[in-house]
C-alpha cells in the first residue's frame, strides 16, 4: 500500500515524545529501507557496524559522528554533520552517532540482506582495544540495538578491557563530548 508524505516539522510537533533513550529513534518507514527520525540528546559509547551504507541528514542542529576509519589504519575520527548537511557512511565502518539536545536528524538504512550481521562494538577509552562486541542479524533497529546497549551496561565483565583492565564506560563521561552546536561553523 502506498503511504502518505510525512511533514517533518508537524510530525516532530506531534510525536517528539517517541524519541526515547538510549537510541532516541523512531522508525517511520520499514519496508526495503528503514527511515528513522532521530533526536538528541543521546549518550552511548558503542560503535555500530553494519554491512550496508547509512545515509545521514541533519534537519536541526549539528551532530557528531565518531568513526573508526577502516581506510586509514582504523584511526578514530570525528565527523561533524551540521544542519542541512547529508553524509553517506560506507558499509562496515564502525560509527557512534552522538546527538545533542534539541537536534533532529534522519537516518536511512537498507534492509539487511539475508545472512548479514550487524555488530555493536565497544572500545577501551585508554588503549583503544576492542572490549566487547555483540552481533546479530538486524530485523528491528529500534529494539535490537537498545537490547545490546542495555546488556553491555548491566555486565561489568563485558565492559572490562582484557588488555589493560580498564572498565569501559557505557555512557560518555560528563563534559567529554564537545557540542558543535556551541561553536561557530
Curated annotation (Swiss-Prot):
<feature type="binding site">
    <location>
        <position position="44"/>
    </location>
    <ligand>
        <name>O2</name>
    </ligand>
</feature>
<keyword id="KW-0479">Metal-binding</keyword>
<comment type="function">
    <text>Catalyzes the oxidative ring opening of 3-hydroxyanthranilate to 2-amino-3-carboxymuconate semialdehyde, which spontaneously cyclizes to quinolinate.</text>
</comment>
<keyword id="KW-0560">Oxidoreductase</keyword>
<feature type="binding site">
    <location>
        <position position="54"/>
    </location>
    <ligand>
        <name>substrate</name>
    </ligand>
</feature>
<dbReference type="GO" id="GO:0019805">
    <property type="term" value="P:quinolinate biosynthetic process"/>
</dbReference>
<feature type="binding site">
    <location>
        <position position="109"/>
    </location>
    <ligand>
        <name>substrate</name>
    </ligand>
</feature>
<keyword id="KW-0408">Iron</keyword>
<feature type="binding site">
    <location>
        <position position="99"/>
    </location>
    <ligand>
        <name>substrate</name>
    </ligand>
</feature>
<dbReference type="Pfam" id="PF06052">
    <property type="entry name" value="3-HAO"/>
</dbReference>
<feature type="binding site">
    <location>
        <position position="54"/>
    </location>
    <ligand>
        <name>Fe cation</name>
    </ligand>
</feature>
<comment type="similarity">
    <text>Belongs to the 3-HAO family.</text>
</comment>
<comment type="pathway">
    <text>Cofactor biosynthesis; NAD(+) biosynthesis; quinolinate from L-kynurenine: step 3/3.</text>
</comment>
<feature type="binding site">
    <location>
        <position position="161"/>
    </location>
    <ligand>
        <name>a divalent metal cation</name>
    </ligand>
</feature>
<dbReference type="GO" id="GO:0008198">
    <property type="term" value="F:ferrous iron binding"/>
</dbReference>
<dbReference type="GO" id="GO:0000334">
    <property type="term" value="F:3-hydroxyanthranilate 3,4-dioxygenase activity"/>
</dbReference>
<dbReference type="GO" id="GO:0005737">
    <property type="term" value="C:cytoplasm"/>
</dbReference>
<dbReference type="GO" id="GO:0043420">
    <property type="term" value="P:anthranilate metabolic process"/>
</dbReference>
<keyword id="KW-0662">Pyridine nucleotide biosynthesis</keyword>
<keyword id="KW-0963">Cytoplasm</keyword>
<feature type="binding site">
    <location>
        <position position="48"/>
    </location>
    <ligand>
        <name>Fe cation</name>
    </ligand>
</feature>
<dbReference type="InterPro" id="IPR011051">
    <property type="entry name" value="RmlC_Cupin_sf"/>
</dbReference>
<keyword id="KW-0223">Dioxygenase</keyword>
<dbReference type="InterPro" id="IPR014710">
    <property type="entry name" value="RmlC-like_jellyroll"/>
</dbReference>
<dbReference type="GO" id="GO:0034354">
    <property type="term" value="P:'de novo' NAD biosynthetic process from L-tryptophan"/>
</dbReference>
<feature type="binding site">
    <location>
        <position position="127"/>
    </location>
    <ligand>
        <name>a divalent metal cation</name>
    </ligand>
</feature>
<feature type="binding site">
    <location>
        <position position="95"/>
    </location>
    <ligand>
        <name>Fe cation</name>
    </ligand>
</feature>
<dbReference type="InterPro" id="IPR010329">
    <property type="entry name" value="3hydroanth_dOase"/>
</dbReference>
<dbReference type="GO" id="GO:0006569">
    <property type="term" value="P:L-tryptophan catabolic process"/>
</dbReference>
<protein>
    <recommendedName>
        <fullName>3-hydroxyanthranilate 3,4-dioxygenase</fullName>
        <ecNumber>1.13.11.6</ecNumber>
    </recommendedName>
</protein>
<feature type="binding site">
    <location>
        <position position="124"/>
    </location>
    <ligand>
        <name>a divalent metal cation</name>
    </ligand>
</feature>
<feature type="binding site">
    <location>
        <position position="164"/>
    </location>
    <ligand>
        <name>a divalent metal cation</name>
    </ligand>
</feature>
Amino acid at each position: 500500500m502506498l503511504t502518505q508524505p510525512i511533514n517533518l516539522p508537524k510530525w516532530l510537533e506531534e510525536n517528539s515524545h517517541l524519541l526515547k533513550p538510549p537510541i532516541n529513534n523512531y522508525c517511520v518507514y520499514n519496508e526495503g529501507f528503514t527511515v528513522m527520525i532521530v533526536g538528541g540528546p543521546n549518550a552511548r559509547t558503542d560503535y555500530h557496524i553494519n554491512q550496508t551504507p547509512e545515509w545521514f541528514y541533519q534537519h536541526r542542529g549539528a551532530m557528531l559522528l565518531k568513526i573508526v576509519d577502516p581506510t586509514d589504519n582504523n584511526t578514530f575520527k570525528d565527523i561533524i554533520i551540521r544542519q542541512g548537511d547529508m553524509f553517506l557512511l560506507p558499509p562496515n565502518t564502525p560509527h557512534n552517532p552522538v546527538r545533542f539536545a534539541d537536534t533532529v536528524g534522519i537516518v536511512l538504512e537498507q534492509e539487511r540482506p539475508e545472512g548479514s550481521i550487524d555488530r555493536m562494538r565497544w572500545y577501551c577509552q585508554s588503549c583503544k582495544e576492542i572490549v566487547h562486541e555483540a552481533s546479530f542479524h538486524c530485523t528491528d533497529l529500534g529494539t535490537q540495538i537498545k537490547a545490546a546497549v542495555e546488556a553491555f551496561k548491566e555486565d561489568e565483565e563485558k565492559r572490562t578491557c582484557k588488555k589493560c583492565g580498564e572498565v569501559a564506560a557505557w555512557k560518555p563521561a560528563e563534559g567529554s563530548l564537545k557540542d558543535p552546536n556551541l561553536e561557530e561553523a
